[in-house]
Amino acid sequence: MQHDLDNQIIACGEDIDHTLAMEELEHWDWTKQNRLPFQLYLAVMHLNEIPEWLDETMLIECVYYFKELINHRDPYDTDEFNAWNMNGKPFKTMWKICKFCYTNCEDPDEYRFMYNRTVFVEDAEDIINRLQDGSSWCQICHTCPLFNISVIYENSPNKKRRYSSSSEEDEYMSNSFYVKHPNSRH
């Protein structure tokens, strides 16, 4: 009996935390790329309808770094055998990471970094899918989105550019380039 009661209390507490997180999510500033508290992250992952704070179409700015392992080891080293695939490369060689994990990288000389920025417009349903897609979040800390969400104002240059473009290729802007980590010794 006590076990069932404890489970109900825990479930009630989780429901209250989830409800509070959903309310707090309405006030979250999606225009800045910040790590979400874990309760808010869980609330985002459990959105099942389009929230009021999300406009029908919004501007998305994906900003992240690729962290790529530079292979300095001998792939035939028996101590490392389990970490290498059949091609002699590590199983996981590249991660999409947020600016915080990029800045706090402890061993930058082991990696090569590429900065990526892409700007485009998405509708609310696609934004919900992006919010709940694990590949849209930092692959190291997992609670920082790799994108910003902004409102498109009536007179904003982004809205004019979107509606004046005639091809789909003009509806987004993207650039990528390698960057030197500030803590790198090379």
Curated annotation (Swiss-Prot):
Pfam families: NS3
Descriptive protein name: Putative non-structural protein NS3
Organism: Junonia coenia densovirus (isolate pBRJ/1990)
Gene assigned in the entry: NS3
